[in-house]
Amino acid sequence: MLQLLKAFQQQGYAVVYASPAEESDHAVDLSQLNIRAERIELNNASFDTFIAQLNPQVVMFDRFMMEEQFSWRVEQHCPQAVRVLDSEDLHFLRHARHAALKAGITANQMPADEYLYSELAKREIAAILRCDITLTISEFEMTLLQRRFQIPADILHYCPFMLERGQADFELPEFSQRQHFVSIGNFRHEPNWDAVRYLKETLWPLIRRQLPAAQLHVYGAYPPKKATQLHNDKQGFLLKGWADDALRVVADARVLLAPLRFGAGLKGKLIDAALCHTPALTTTIGAEGLYRDSDDARQRAGYAAAGVNLADAALVADDPAEYARLAVELYQQQPQWQRASQAAAQVIDCRFSYARHQARLSDKLAQVSAQLQQHRLQNFYGSMLRHHSLKSSQYMSQWIEAKNRLKDIGG
């Protein structure tokens, strides 16, 4: 999100960040970034006054739930504003994979129809169709939306993480200076919590049997009591909780473990590993969208000439025994580790260049803004959904608003 806000600022927009959420303990101070922060309320007409007075040129919804809540109000009061949905990842895909895992189906990138075509999918796809542009974070999800849900390509825009090399602004340790394994991720995110339990119950015992002196340092915000109870010094399974500097702890580790069995989108922990030149070990789902070749022909040729293969940055295994074997090899064998570290060092420039993706986003916004009426006419199903389903969201919101008003009067 911060990368997108910065990109909008560089395009000349004055950015206002409006949220109904309570401020987190770890929230960024947006005022330091010259971004105005506003508190808004769900199901409250005060937003109508706020958005009408603001009269923005572009409105971006942070995931489909915010689109459901506020897009009808934006359309009513600022009909010429370009409506952008930041999908982050496809929620329905993550939930479909989770449901498949619970049913005993593992490591399946494309869940069966019974899991994929869910009520959640209907809501999220409807939000995508109602918006002028939806930002998708991985090519896999772009392809899924177009092939399985027939979403028009011109309302989708591939916009992954936008990063710059050197964000780890300290000297990165070499192989001999690093030790132990690291796992990192917010415990409130279900795929992360599942990965921690999978490590504790299945993978770490296999790894530790071969590396009895190794430790696994597990970091993440908001660890619940059931997570801290997994801490065991004797087993080398150490729950560390919140990391004050995530890049430092990833850089100090020799290998990052990310055994994600479900989820969607791009995995921030693997991006952190790339920023720190830390080799990683993940799963098919974990590696999704991260390590493909560059779409820049000159870059591809340069990496090929240098013998760099981006796929070396993270080894992939879905079988527990194979995962443990690769973890031990990557930890012990310096030549293999060096090859992986060198590949990781190229991932950011090759796949997630801030300059390249910021320019493409700017071009897409300019193109849609210049032809907004025609763009919307061509998205017939989107206009049909705005006509029908937004009315139901509108009336439900207005009903809740009226109910709350009556309760306040009665109270």
Please give the residue ranges for each predicted region.
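N-terminal subdomain of nucleotide-sugar transferases
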Residues: 1-27
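Conserved catalytic-core segment of nucleotide-activated headgroup transferases in glycan assembly
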Residues: 16-17, 147-151, 156-246, 251-252
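Acidic donor-binding loop of glycosyltransferase active sites
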Residues: 56-57, 132, 251-265, 276-278
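A short, active-site helix/loop in glycosyltransferases that binds the activated sugar's phosphate group
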Residues: 69-70, 118-153, 227
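Acceptor-binding helix/loop patch of EC 2.4 sugar-transfer enzymes
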Residues: 80, 85-117
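Short hydrophobic beta-strand element within catalytic cores of glycosyltransferases
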Residues: 269-272, 279-286
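C-terminal "capping" alpha-helix adjacent to the active site of nucleotide-linked donor transferases
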Residues: 297-306, 315-336
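C-terminal amphipathic helix plus adjacent low-complexity
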Residues: 336-338, 342-411
